Amino acid sequence: KKLLKNFVFEMPYAHFLGIDATHKNNKLVTILPYSSSLIGNPMLPALHGGVTASFLEISAVLELYWGVISTNWRFSSDQLNRTSSTGSIFHGQIPKTIDFTIDYLRPGQPKDAYAEAEIKRAGRRYASVYVEAWQEDRKKLYAQASGHFLMPNNNE
């Protein structure tokens, strides 16, 4: 769990948005807590599309960290206790986005949002991830995305 919290802490924008992650039913679920500052259209009101896109992309990267990087890389207990003020456990190496396609299915309501990502393919250099986001009802998605990522080299 500490490693998961460190993953979020390593991404400044995720930290800024207040994104958190937890395990539910043996899956990683990313949480975007509602804040009025996330509203893009105050007339509806609806979550800003850029916030939704960022949330989905961060969810994909967290899934890659959790599903691939954390199981293939070995971290000492000293590394796991580091914070960004004392140095990154990842040395700035995060998966780099090659492309990311978002489908906005309905407006995001002024409520907490949840996302779950699934790694479709992960190799040494490339990974493909699919992400779904919902709010109150897991079956009523408000956005979905697919992305391709260049994986970091853990030998550097």
Locations of the language-model features?
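Terminal targeting signals and extreme-terminal segments of soluble enzymes
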Residues: 1-156
